[in-house]
Amino acid sequence: MTDPVLVANGLVRRFGDLTAVDDVSFRIEPGETYGLLGPNGAGKTTIISMVAGLLGPDAGETRILGKAIGPGVVSAKAHIGLVPQELAIYPDLTGRENLRFFGRLQKLGGDQLKRRIDEVLTVIGLEDRGGDLTKEYSGGMKRRLNIGIGLLHQPELLILDEPTVGVDPQSRNSILKSVEALAVSGMAVLYTTHYMEEAERLCDRIGILDHGVMQAEGTRDELLVLTGETDRVHLEGTGNLEAATTALRRLGAVKSVTGDRRNIERSGCDCPCGG
């Protein structure tokens, strides 16, 4: 049996009197896209900071390929590509020059780096725009280049922190297509979002977070099963279903709960796609 790429076990993180993350556990298998779904303030960014080794937990641990992760553990971090919400690109460099710069920071060079830049530009759909200055890029193109930087060193796990924030619907769709291409390539991805339809589209399994607690976890079919023309969904899976329902309401993804089986009527899409 193949070992998981990532195991997070009992993560707790406090900031003063605030418990931002409270006993969160999950794992990511090879080739799996795992989504952390929750409203702003749910604890998503704190979790990925711990997973990436930027922030130490107050309790619990994370392991990638069996190696413990934490601040200062360089060997484990080499397996992770972190793509934060903030853009890490230089506007007066071309897309290709940005990738070359960050590749050299990661100790890549020569023909290996050139080949890898070509591969990354193809994966993110910018093979025809790699020679353009990034200040001429659209918001979505900049986001995709940001993803490309995280891919350069061929990590076993790519972490994407809300990569579609602040972009128009067309750009957003292009970003999602790039993430789908990563899934086809077999890369493991940890994807955070507060858009439920993004999680449904991209993720093999989804963890629903609210107030730092994992309220429910499961596959798309386990968590949200569409029931045809009634435009209703059925919430299943493990965890506190009532709390998960509350979290989904806060996301604007549901508007009513009826019956013992907790059938949930979907509201209109809350994402920027206009749905």
Segments from the language model and where they lie:
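Short, solvent-exposed coil/turn segments
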Residues: 1, 21, 119, 228-230, ...
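Generic marker of residues within folded, mature protein domains
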Residues: 1, 137, 223-227
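ABC transporter nucleotide-binding domains
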Residues: 3-8, 13-216
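ABC transporter nucleotide-binding domain
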Residues: 176-267
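Low-complexity basic/metal-binding stretches
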Residues: 268-275
